[in-house]
Amino acid sequence: MTNFKLKIASRRSKLAMVQTLWVKDQLEKNIPNLEVSIEAMATQGDKILDVALAKIGDKGLFTKELEAQMLVGQADIAVHSLKDLPTNLPSGLKLGCITKREDPADALVVSKKNDCYKLETLPAGSIVGTSSLRRLAQLRNKYPHLNFKDIRGNVITRIEKLDAGEFDCIILAAAGLKRLGFESRIHQIIPNEISLHAVGQGALGIECKSDDKKVLEIISVLEDKPTSQRCLAERAFLRELEGGCQVPIGVNSSIQNEQLYLTGMVASLDGERLIKDQYIGNIDDPEQVGKELAKKLKLQGADKILSEIFEQFREN
């Protein structure tokens, strides 16, 4: 039988390649006569390293170049960290598969001199590195005595900056640390009570052409239904709020007794205003769960906070 050839578009960062190689390996294991190749490239978000992510904007910052490859027929699928994939995709493309989720939580990584501290016991003025406005707003809300500083670069670069003494600690996604073999550097998993994670964090999203039935059938072998239900609810929540991955919006989701539990948070940039609530709904209608939670937060003033943030972005 003739091999079916499938080309994957991927970012060329170490983490992206680890994730893409995992997808390649799993597809080839599960689909007989499948030949998978990878086209690695840099995205805008990979190239601009001297500006805070929030100031660049986030419309396809880490995805646009990969999507262009699919739209011109140079790639069949693109593998993304789902948290980087915008909730509104270009015409002709769709989120075809969501893989089983790694731990979605944020993690504290500390310098050697600070390994006796947890996040809640760090001395006043400690320098905490994060590039995420979501983490920044929540941690400012809980720990206003700490000094937060922007940090850019890939996971390895950030750890090197920490070890060089630029920061006392940094906050990273636990999933990325584990996938890159840095699990031993996880000093503390940050509880949801302190910091809700990003939408889709810990899961991989496989994007493809909307009308490519053969490719959709192939990638469906990697679909994890519970992860998909949770992440679709999270993404619907984010979409309904018209937020992006660089806005202070956090979530947590779980499935209990055939019900989908979704907690969501919106905060001001300074962390002084933080709105958090939960919605419990039908596991088979995750989109509705996300929309209903967004409505609850809007009624409490979330849309006012977000419009102020967008106005600040426009001014800057």
UniProtKB/Swiss-Prot annotation:
Co-factor binding comment: Binds 1 dipyrromethane group covalently.
Entry's Gene Ontology BP terms: chlorophyll biosynthetic process; protoporphyrinogen IX biosynthetic process
Catalytic activity line of the entry: 4 porphobilinogen + H2O = hydroxymethylbilane + 4 NH4(+)
Single Gene Ontology MF annotation: hydroxymethylbilane synthase activity
E.C. number: 2.5.1.61
Keywords carried by this UniProt record: Chlorophyll biosynthesis, Porphyrin biosynthesis, Transferase
One GO term describing the cellular component: cytoplasm
Annotated positions of the S-(dipyrrolylmethanemethyl)cysteine modification: 245
Endpoints of the signal sequence: none
Cofactor(s) demanded: dipyrromethane
One of the Pfam families matching this protein, by short name: Porphobil_deamC
Top-level enzyme category: transferase
Gene3D superfamilies: Periplasmic binding protein-like II, Porphobilinogen deaminase, C-terminal domain
Pathway(s) the chain acts in: Porphyrin-containing compound metabolism; protoporphyrin-IX biosynthesis; coproporphyrinogen-III from 5-aminolevulinate: step 2/4; Porphyrin-containing compound metabolism; chlorophyll biosynthesis
Classification via PROSITE patterns: PORPHOBILINOGEN_DEAM
General remark: The porphobilinogen subunits are added to the dipyrromethane group.
Family as reported in the entry's similarity comment: Belongs to the HMBS family.
Function, in words: Tetrapolymerization of the monopyrrole PBG into the hydroxymethylbilane pre-uroporphyrinogen in several discrete steps.
Subunit structure of this chain's protein: Monomer.
Name of the protein in question: Porphobilinogen deaminase
